[in-house]
Amino acid sequence: MSLTVVPAYEHPQEIGALFSEYTQALIAGEPSFSGYLSLQNYDEEVQHLEEKYGMPWGRLYLARWNGAPAGCVGLRRMDEWNCEMKRLYVRPQYRDKRIGGKLVQQVIDDAKTIGYSHMLLDTFSFLDSAVRMYRALGFYEIERYNNNPIDGCIYMKLDL
């Protein structure tokens, strides 16, 4: 049983499938999330991954478990000092393997190497295991930092 984490730019179909599963899971938990996707230009994001997550300021990773696509995470630049973790998702059948934590640690390490001072994220309160993981990694709650209109959203920050 092995985990590999690789840059995802050469795997658009696998990332597209993971992003689709991710958004469907969020819409199932919070139906109003579908409206927020349009504010984020989500369809365009999926078609042009490198524009949002490309190097040198961003990252996009694909996690594989025994070669099968298991999860993903993105990192995007907000400004010179701040970045945002996006689209962390692990398929349900792989959630007991600590893949999410490895993906998050990968983008934290990258953010430090790039030179960011802070990493931000938004998540939903119903994603309780993710919120617990973020807190365990040092993230803390902050005020809203983006245009997310959804009630029940949690905004978090990590000092790098």
How would you describe each model-predicted region?
Residues 72, 101, 133, 154-158:
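Accessory recognition modules or surfaces
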Residues 120-131, 135-155:
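Conserved catalytic-core motifs of GNAT/GCN5-like acyltransferases
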Residues 95:
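Glycine-rich ATP-binding loop(s) of histidine-kinase-like ATPases
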Residues 111-122:
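Conserved GNAT acetyl-CoA-binding A-motif
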Residues 3-86, 91-92, 104-106, 110, ...:
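Acetyl-CoA-dependent GNAT
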Residues 80-82, 118, 153:
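A generic structural signal for beta-strand entry/edge sites
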Residues 67, 98, 115:
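Conserved G/P- and acidic residue-centered "switch" motifs that form tight phosphate/ATP-binding loops
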Residues 98, 102, 106, 128-129:
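Alpha-helical macromolecular-interaction surfaces
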